[in-house]
Amino acid sequence: MSSFIPLNFLEDTVSKKDLEEEHTRELQVEQAYKLFQSALKLQKQKQYESAYKVYEELFKLDIVSNHYFEELDFIRGLQDGSQNTDTDELTLLSPNVKSLRYLIFRNRGFLYLDMLKSNTENKSAEKVKEMFYPLLDDFCIALLYNEPDEKLLETLHEIFSYIGSERLSRFVLEYSLTSRKESDDLSGLLPIDQTVLSQYKTMLEHLSSGKFPKLDLKHLSFLEPIRLDIFAQQEKLASKKVAVIKSTSTKWVDLLDAINIHLKENQDESKIEDANRPRIRIFEPYVLTEEPLDIVRIEFTKRGVAVPATETEVTKAQPEQIVQERKPEEDNRVQRSSKRLSKVEDEIPAVTLESSHFLNMDYFRNQMNETIPNFEIFDVCSTYVEDGSGAQYIKDFKNIVSDWNDSYARAILSYDTAKSEDDNLKLLDLLSGYGKSEELKEKNIPPLGEIDIEFPELNYVEFKTYIIKHLLSKILTTKWSDKLYEKFTEWIVQFEGYIINDIDVESAIGVLEVLVDISTSLESQIKDSINNKLNKAVVNSMCQDLLRIKDKIIRWINYIETFPINDLQVASRFKWCQIIKEKAETKSWTENHPVKHKLQKLLGDAHFKINYPNYKNFIDFSKDSINSQLTIISVLAIFWRILSTSSTEDNKEAIRLLEDILLDSNTEPSDAILSIRNFLKQGSIDMKLSLWNILLSFYQSSNSGDKLTVGFEECVLFLNDYLVNEYVLLDEESRLVTLSRILGFYGSSISFVVTSLASTNWILMHPIKVQTLRLFFELSLLFEINEEASYISSLATSIKSKSTKSYHHLTNTLIKTIILILASIQKSNPQILHSVIRLFHTQLGLIGICGHAGGSFLEIAQEYLKSLPNSDQDICQIIKCKYHYSISIDGVVPADHGTARLDELNKNDCKELASFVLPLCFSKGGSTLNNVPKHDIKLLIDEIYDVIGDPDFDSNEALGRNKATLNYFLDNTRLTKRLFQEAFHGLVRLELGEAEEDKQFNGLYYIEGLLLFSSYKLRKKNMQSRAVELESAISLFENDIICGSNRFESWFLLGQSYGYLVEDDLIWTADKLTASDRKITTANLQRKSLICYLMAINKSLDESIKDVIKPVVGNLMSLFAKEMFSAVCEPMSMHAFKVQSHPRFINRVNGALFEPVSQFPAVDKTVCLKIIQQSLQLSIKSSCREWSDYYYLAKVQRKLDKPAGLVMETMASACRSAFKNKHADNIIEPHYNLVSFALKYVKSNRLDSKDALKYLIEDPLIKLEVGEETDFIKLIIKALNKIDSSDKKNWQHKAKYRLARLMQEEYHDVKGAIDQMSSFISLKTPNKALVSIWKPEPERPGKHFLYTFQYIHFYIELLKEIDDLDSLVAMLPKLRRSNSVMINLSIAWEILCSSVCKIIRESYGIGDNFEFTENLINTLPYQTFAANVKLLPDMMRRQSVPENLKSVLCFLFTVNDIKKLNNGYGPTSFIDDTLVTLYFMIYLNYFEKSSTEVTTDSPGLKKKIAKRDIFPLTNDILKAFKKDIEDVTKQKSYNELITAQKLKQGLNEDKSLENVPASANVNEIIVIDDDDDDNLSQEPATKKSKTESNS
């Protein structure tokens, strides 16, 4: 088999599964055949029980046991015939499986037959039955799978003949004769079996004579029990079945119940399963019974006899039942939550409610009455708790809320605007149904009496027909109970098909009336179900029922029309029924509707009256009712014109008609309008409410806000009047439902007004009197009191727990009423408006609903409060409720009112918030720099910025130009003297265009940047800051400027932000300070920082923002001066004055080139220092007396060579100011500089020592005690020690360094100086850092890298001075790795390497020049040297290394390591010469004589030794004598070896105590001045020693 698999091959998991199933099926077929063969073998051996067990095993296999449902589908398919569209699985079975099943069923049948034949004497009749019927089943099932063989057919023919089943016997013969012709097998080619044909002919001859042929079937005598059983069953079926139905009373309803129950008890369950379930409703129950009811007898029993309660299979669904059965999911959730909370509710005590329980509401009512003139709300608290108090509608409303039910919920939600657009058509339903109500029907109709007739013994169909005819004769003359009528209509629907051809015309009309009544009710239920959004399956089922009923109606109309009707009343009754049917089905009405003509035609014959006391949808027939219907049709035609409007013009016409009807706007109304008005006076309140609802909705859809307001006010006035007057006349039940509908209508109508009000920015177009709204406002307050009471006492029940939708409707009604009250008083006294808003919000917040109704109350309150003074706290409360951001003002924190949070803000929300929050950020007095918004506002600003995002520079050309202008200005502006002059005189102009941005967001980018910048500074104190935060802040400040603000604060903070970026570049690593070109990026940042500071200074001269500038100008000048000082001095060294972002193309003498850095700064350093001095003086003058300002001013004054006294006085001021600082313990710098300046001025003779000491004595930290000490240096050391001991955090290092310098320079105490420096310089291996110094907060960024270089340089010189070679060698690897912690590492490295080499050379008396090696190389013949060096290692091993060479080997090892560390880094000549010198010392020890021999050079040979030839030789020696070197270094240190060697040379042992001038080429010690001299990081200068050098 090929192993090739295509690349595009995809494994089909479904096919794979099918293959697996097929494989399993094949295995089962194989297993089944084996078992079948085994069973067949046992069957032949007459081991019947064993064979039966094998068959049982066979039927456990899936391939066999799954036969039932396949066969059932196959049989049903045959029964359905052409209507069958499903493919049954039986036809898809493989031939193997079909053959297998055929054999199994056939042979198991014969097994049963054999078992019956054997031992028949011991088998009971029941046992025979148990085996015979499975036998027949198996034979019959076998016929489904294959064509039967002759034996099977013959056996079936004999069995059927024996048991007397003539039809089945004949069927078998006919099947035998026709099966071959119909078969597709080869057997179809065989001729007909003559024996079977002969038997069939004989049977036909006997049947023609009325007799069935007798066959000799004695061999089947064992089936005699079966034959007898079948005969008994047939006799039983032939006898008549008498059904005795017992009724509990002689009432018709109980009789119908009894008949229904009897039928249900005798129904066949299998028939019910087979029947189509949805059709059971219209099924006659008798069809589903097991046995026929040939005779029906009725027996009346007394009450108490155990008769099952009436329960029909399917009752007609009533609207209330449907609502209860099919509630929406939301209502179900409410019920579930109510169940969960039932325990909590049970725990609420049954407290008797009193007015004192509602003090908040009472306070609110009193305040409202005091605040709003003439509002006068009644005492709602007392009214609620006192029974029987208040007007009728008040009492009824209390009853409604205390005993809430579904009918109130349906009524109050009937005008819910969320329903479908077809709701307006309810008005047509109301009008078209006018007259159906009970009050318009005849009252004096006698009730249907008890059963007064005898029932003949009839079969079921005749019996039921008899009852229906009798009841139809009384349906118009007697009044029935609803239950009886309901059961009777059910009978008519189920049974009408049996009586349609056996009934008189009058009864037929009665059946038609019942069907029309059912159809009309069902159509109304379907409409309600659709509007109530019930389950689609329920609606579909009702629609199917309606279609069936309509089919029945058509059939009955056709049937009745076949009768000649001569009786006028009967004919009128038939026509009236048809008119009612057509009217109910009419969807559109016109003036010339066919129904109208039919009514007019019928009017002439209406000289009598027909009552319809039982039909729900029939109006009594009379001349008055016909006239009423004609009027209603005329009204419907007009209303149809109103409701069917589609265009604006039609809409106007509809509005005009409604205004004429409802508002009496036409002084001369037409007759039609007058008739409608009269009609409405007689009609129910529902019609008027529907008309008002339509008018108001038209106003809203046509955006007629003023008309909507007027119409609403007129409508509310009408409702107020109605509730006080006409409402009282209604009965109690009608009142409660009517009041609920009025509240629902009011809530819907006020929603129209509030929606319109929102579209006009909450300005009411037409004023509404507040008193008009009082009645419904009071009802709403009663509702809220009831809700509050439900939390206090279990005697009160919350509507929310029973109907969430109703609760929200009433809550929203309260809020919208409040909105209209606010809109009505909006133009009154602002103080009243403010007080009312606060009252409403407090009260609504207490009950947690201020955010309901879509937040409309919060919207209108926010809009009105914008223009009211002193409303910030109220607006903050609205923001808390609306957006859940808590903003506190003056310590007042908004309360949590439990409102729902918005999912996320959108741009419109942000506009609203920004219009309040951004001005609030700028309104807190002074500059925002000193009043940074708090955390609560920060969260909100962040959210707004996230939604708004950065400006869209691509789509907004003005913004794009502004951005390019700003970037060009920052990138290309150089720090020139002219720029400084113009900035300090306010003359710099940056021309930015006016951007078209939303004014609401003016300042957003600045505030967001300010918050980000403040966060960075806070994190910076905790060492958690990130540069990315600064970059984001810079972008935001630039966006603020780009949008045209030219804001002083943005420039100021931009300067600080860029300054912090400079600090971030300089503070962590010295990488950007090691070379001039590496400083360019940092210098550009510093240049931008200074430019932004200058722009802020330029803007600070604007008189319009003088109040904002004044508090921060000192800080501005201080920060600018410090940033500029940092730019002028080391380590930046005026670099910011030389660079710009883009290199300039310069034409030099040596050619044109791009120059990133100018050779000379654009401003002289002295000018810069004077600007810094002036800025610091301005800062100090502005009362910003920061110690660092004095500190930097003193440094600048010293650099400008100001008098020593002035400098010292300024620094003393810095010391005094620092000592008063709350962090005085950490501020050491000014005190140290005071000592340092005193020392330098005294040594330079610019200040008398007494004057200098005076400053130190008066310093609050040093407090120098002079005593009798006269040595100025010792007093300075004492002051320095005092400063050092004051450093609690051990951050300061300059005092220690100065002490070390004084010890070395003044007292030649080198070891003491080394001890001082060792406090922060560590040569120990565990300490990875060579120098451990920290940057104190006041120290300029990058300065500590200069100090590190200075200290290392000084430390090396100290170690060299005492020949401490061990320490110097230990310093080598650490210093080599110190590139990131210091500047000028190469210089320090060169000094260290040269110092090690010098100490070694000096110990052997070799100077710093290269005379020794040069002389030797020039005199030593190369051939001799080459020959000797090959012998040198062996000679050293053979003769052993002498003592005088062991130290040379150790030094050679050290210098070789230095050479490796120095490779590719520093100068090498001095190190190489030292290495060669040491090697030649070893060489000369063995070949001293040969080195002076003179040889003749041969042509072509190398003549001179090169130093590089020596390096491999040194490596060879070091490798060969590595162990010897290790032994020596373990026994002696390098210092001991140096000391021993110098003793040999006759030098003084204690060199450290002798004042020896520096030898030639010794590097001068670099001193970094504490006031930032300019030559700090330059390469050290050298000077010649005054002593003579040794040759």
UniProtKB/Swiss-Prot annotation:
For this entry, list what GO says about its biological process. chromatin organization; chromosome segregation; filamentous growth; hyphal growth; positive regulation of filamentous growth
This protein's source sits in the domain of life called Eukaryota
One cellular component GO annotation, for this chain's record?
nucleus
Q: Where is the composition biased (Basic and acidic residues)?
A: 323-334, 1581-1591
Q: Which UniProt keywords apply?
A: Chromosome partition, Nucleus, Transcription, Transcription regulation
Location in or out of the cell = Nucleus
Family, as annotated: Belongs to the HIR3 family.
Function, please?
Answer: Has a role in a nucleosome assembly pathway that is required for the integrity of heterochromatin and proper chromosome segregation.
- Protein name stated in the entry: Histone transcription regulator 3 homolog
This protein's encoding gene: HIR3
